[in-house]
Regions:
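Bacterial Sec-dependent N-terminal signal peptides
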Residues: 1-23, 246
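Subset of outer-membrane beta-barrel
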Residues: 21-252
Length: 252
């Protein structure tokens, strides 16, 4: 009898739970369940150099680093063969659709002593000339939206195997030309961000009697403040992301 009562109680409780789950949710409850993280200034995630782009964006743990390595892993510039270097690139964007959208990148580095390096970079993204209109389709003027970021980086080698680097970044984005829409004044957005980079390298003995090289790289990119184009709108994150990579070198 006791067992029967227990089962009946469980059945009633379960039915009540299912009934509560089937209750329609209010719009306020639905809004509270939305936890999508939105970001802005996506141009910060564009691959700046053709070398890493051709290899599928695997620049975090490259052997033989060059000037562009400051964007992928600042700590890897310690291993650059040359004392100084610079790189400049330009990529047309959606060239088959428009002719005035493009991404430009300029970077350079210099070694300081035997165990340190500094770098600087600028990336610029132009969205081309745009005709703005009001809600009725009447033209309100033309503007060329543009975005840019200025970087300054430093790297140091703590041991023969371990090095660390940081990048500090100023971000500017102007998409509206300081226009007002629907009673809201829009402006250029500014913000700050930074990268933290780590590199660990070691050697393992190979079958041919030599040593193979292994590198592990990590880059936490765009750790920064929220940005907004209007004081009346919510602020959005910059696109923070994590990059990890492994490099292996074997002499044949």
């Amino acid at each position: 009898m006791k067992k029967t009562a227990t089962i009946a109680l469980f059945t009633i409780s379960s039915w009540g739970f299912l009934q509560s789950q089937n209750r329609p949710l209010s719009s306020k409850e639905l809004a509270g369940q939305l936890n999508t993280v939105t970001t802005m200034v996506p141009f910060l995630t564009i691959t700046p150099d053709s070398r890493s782009a051709a290899m599928g964006d695997v620049g975090v743990a490259l052997f033989d680093p060059d000037a562009n390595s400051g964007s992928w892993n600042m700590a890897n510039l310690i291993n650059a063969k040359n004392k100084t270097g610079f790189s400049m690139s330009y990529a047309p964007w959606l060239r088959n659709l428009v002719s005035d959208v493009g991404f430009s990148y300029l970077t350079g580095y210099s070694k300081v002593g035997a165990n340190s390096a500094v770098s600087g970079a600028m990336r610029y993204f132009s969205l081309g000339n745009i005709q703005f209109t009001d809600f009725d389709g009447n033209p309100t003027g033309q503007f060329t939206p543009n975005e840019f970021a200025l970087d300054g980086g430093y790297a140091t080698q703590f041991t023969k195997k371990f090095s660390m680097g940081v990048n500090l970044r100023f971000v500017y984005s102007n998409l509206t030309g300081n226009r007002a829409y629907n009673g809201i004044d829009y402006k250029a957005a500014t913000g700050g961000a930074g990268d933290v980079n780590l590199l660990y390298k070691t050697e393992v003995k190979s079958n041919n009697g030599g040593y193979d090289k292994i590198q592990f790289g990590l880059n936490i990119q765009n750790i920064g403040s929220k940005m907004t184009y209007s004081s009346k709108e919510k602020r959005d994150f910059v696109p923070t992301n994590l990059k990890m990579g492994v490099g292996y070198s074997h002499k044949i």
